Swiss-Prot record:
Residue ranges of domain ABC transporter in the record: 345-579
Organism: Nitrobacter winogradskyi (strain ATCC 25391 / DSM 10237 / CIP 104748 / NCIMB 11846 / Nb-255)
Superkingdom of source: Bacteria
Cited PROSITE patterns: ABC_TM1F (PS50929), ABC_TRANSPORTER_1 (PS00211), ABC_TRANSPORTER_2 (PS50893), NDVA (PS51317)
Stretches that traverse the bilayer: 22-42, 68-88, 146-166, 167-187, 248-268, 285-305
Enzyme class, spelled out: translocase
Family in the record: Belongs to the ABC transporter superfamily. Beta-(1-->2)glucan exporter (TC 3.A.1.108.1) family.
Molecular function GO labels: ABC-type beta-glucan transporter activity; ABC-type oligopeptide transporter activity; ATP binding; ATP hydrolysis activity
Tagged with keyword Membrane: yes
Protein name, UniProt field: Beta-(1-->2)glucan export ATP-binding/permease protein NdvA
Pfam families: ABC_membrane, ABC_tran
Amino acid sequence: MSMVRLYTRVLELLGAEARLGWILAGANLLLAGAQFAEPVLFGRIIDVLSGNPASGLFGMASTSPWPLLAVWAAFGLFTILCGVTVALQADRLSHRQRQAVLTGYFEHIMQLPLAYHAGTHSGRLMKVMLQGTDALWRLWLGFFREHFAAMMSLVVLLPLSLYINWRLAILLFALCIVFTMLTTLVVRRTFDMQNEVEAHFSDLSARASDALGNVALVQSFVRVDAEVQGLRFVVDKLLSAQMPVLSWWAVVTVMTRASTTITILAIFTAGIALNQRGMTSIGEIVMFVSFATMLIQRLEQVVSFINSVFMEAPRLKEFFDVLDAVPAVRDRPDAVDPGRLQGRVEFNDVSFSYDSKRPAVANLSFVASPGETIALVGPTGAGKSTAVALLHRAFDPQSGIIRIDGMDIRDLTLSGLRRNIGVVFQEPLLFNRSIAENLRVGKPDATDEEMRLAAGRAQALDFIERGEKKFDTHAGERGRMLSGGERQRLSIARALLKDPPILILDEATSALDAVTEAKVNAALDEVMKGRTTFVIAHRLSTIRNAARILVFADGRVIESGTFGELLANGGHFAQLAKAQFMTQESTQADLSSSRTNPAVEIRPLSLGN
């Protein structure tokens, strides 16, 4: 993305504030004209005081300094009032729009597919959001407060200086050419360097976020020093990349100061020579010295603007790259909100592939009646999770149709569809907020009594009531202040509050101990009542009561039936069940033997001699 296109997009993000932006641009143009008038009036007053009549001021002649001083005061008052107004409105515009863009960015990334989030570190997305919106704010604020006025000053000053005295104006044009050449050189030399700097910033943010998100692991494996050393290594690479960029821009600063002195000396030298020939006045020499000082200040502001755009460019590019990421699924223009559905689910010859090479599911067809429990079993990667992900449109199938109550789910709004589907994940997902706030994710307007009832049905009320703050107890980051079973029961209570007609249980008890699993299963039995339920399970003992079991392998359903029917068929499911139950029976026998046989002793594993 070119620098011009990049900055055009920055201005496009002004959105509804664009009208105010145009007003500020017009005010800056007036400011530029008013600021130009001051050195002109100053020079003419010098001429009057030195005995020369002030001719040529917009076609007006004067032999007295007082009218000129009055005009100068009027221009000065206008400049002050207009400048204050521009500054205030520019501040408010940039702050308002920063918050609007930040909110829009957040909404956008929350709608991106899970596959995008799986491949993108959350720390990077946070860094891009905060640094990108801060960069936009700085550019908007600088542009409307200073930089646009500086550019307009150049547009006004250079042509009018030619009109007043073209010989002295040539020196001002030469100064502009030198500045332009120097700035272009530095920008070209440092563009790739600055991109490398921002890449190291992203690495730094991702590494720090990764370590902070795994503090328990770091401390458990005594990795604090190693992680700090790793962070220092990234910081060192960042500084090594940053130093050459800073050196080049330091050269610009030095050359700017040198240009100030050289230009003023050149104007005085040329002015004296022209004055001796009667080709300019003392007032014009003073005027052009003021022009030179003003020009250098404005050029410095323009260079600062170019520098800021250049320095922010990698951050803005990252920001726009995320904004340009397209959600995998979107609402169709004519999508409808279905209201509450009955829960009849039909997969009709559905196929989907993540990489267009190996199918994740292939020619999948089945029907689930309202209130029916369907279990999905099979090895990891067989297509179980993909099938239910297609149901709530995490992705859309490449072929085939999924219908609920006879309607193609792609004809439904995403919010309307997902409002009818509840998910209880294997790893309970909780916010770093109170228990009440986490429960209200399922039903934002839930009353306290509704939350108590849902918690009771989910076997969660006992541990909530034991807490000092009860429903106001903080769950901690990702729910870490609670045990695994407590987190899972809260997620079940949340699903009960949502009260969806369709429920997905994604291995909801696979990581729990036997006692906790019994409590959670009791809660699951409650939440499954009257709902079309899809259960993904590796523990086959948990799906004995399923109305139907679909056995997946390589993205296809290879067997279907009840628990008893599949065992009797002696197929893939029967072999899997036999292996699991034999393992469990062997484990139980070993435990029983260890309790009754005193000769059996458990000893630590010894490595070596």
